[in-house]
A protein has these predicted regions:
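Short, intrinsically disordered, charge-balanced linker/junction segments flanking boundaries
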Residues: 189-192
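Gly/Trp-centered helix-boundary motif
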Residues: 1-61, 65, 69-70, 91, ...
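ABC ATPase nucleotide-binding domain helical subdomain, centered on the C-loop/LSGGQ "ABC signature"
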Residues: 143-146
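Hydrophobic alpha-helical segments of integral membrane proteins
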Residues: 1, 25, 38-42, 78-85, ...
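Small-residue (primarily alanine) positions within well-ordered alpha-helices
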Residues: 71-72, 149
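Faces of alpha-helical transmembrane segments in polytopic inner-membrane proteins
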Residues: 43-47, 56, 60-67, 86-98, ...
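Juxtamembrane "helix exit" motif at the C-terminal ends of alpha-helical transmembrane segments
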Residues: 2, 105-106
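Helix-loop interface residues and adjacent transmembrane-helix termini in multi-pass membrane transporters
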Residues: 73-77, 108, 112
């Protein structure tokens, strides 16, 4: 644990505003212009950002992989129509929409509500990239023998998608995990 509060200024004797690292006062990275501990603020910000980024990644993967698997499995007109909708949605400028929507939210709305709203808006405009990759992986997996065997045994389309195809395309999601976390962090940083 960090010995200082990230919000409260520390006015201990010998600690000045904008001080360099002071080990005797446990200010390992010093203090900022308001006398707050920089290390405490970094750790607190990192914790919040990682929770936000992992929530973002989970929601993007859920939405993008579900839509991509359904498009890849059904193919034909479902795939063609779905792909056109995804292409149109992907061309909406993501960062501008986030900035516009967040600026319209009234200031009396609580901080947690604003963070959840930002998360939902970012997910709504970011799931399309995962859809393309999951669609391609589903096309590849759909041609394998276990899908044919499941169809012959009477499994329905949703059972095949969620019980057979989705678990076998997890490698695609694992590959994109660090990149999606980095996108979430850099997008929130760009809003600052």
């Amino acid at each position: 644990p960090v010995p200082h509060d990230p919000y409260k200024p520390n006015f201990a004797e010998g600690v000045k505003k904008l001080s360099s690292p002071l080990l005797e006062h446990q200010h390992y990275l010093g203090t900022d212009d308001a006398g707050r501990d920089i290390a405490a603020r970094l750790f607190y910000g990192f914790r919040i950002m990682m929770l936000f980024a992992l929530g973002f990644t989970l929601l993007v993967f859920l939405l993008g992989s579900t839509v991509g698997c359904l498009m890849g499995y059904f193919g034909g007109k479902v795939d063609l129509f779905g792909l056109r909708l995804v292409e149109i949605w992907a061309n909406i400028p993501f960062l501008y929409m986030v900035m516009i929507t967040v600026s319209v939210v009234p200031s009396k709305v609580g901080m947690m509500t604003r963070v959840l709203l930002l998360l939902l808006i970012m997910v709504l405009f970011s799931w399309t990239s995962m859809t393309y990759y999951m669609r391609a992986s589903t096309y590849k997996e759909k041609a394998r023998d276990y899908v044919t065997a499941a169809q012959l045994l009477g499994a329905g389309p949703l059972r095949i998608v969620f019980k057979h195809l989705l678990p076998n395309t997890v490698s695609t999601m694992v590959t994109f995990l660090p990149f999606t976390v980095a996108v979430a962090i850099s997008s929130v940083t760009a809003l600052d």
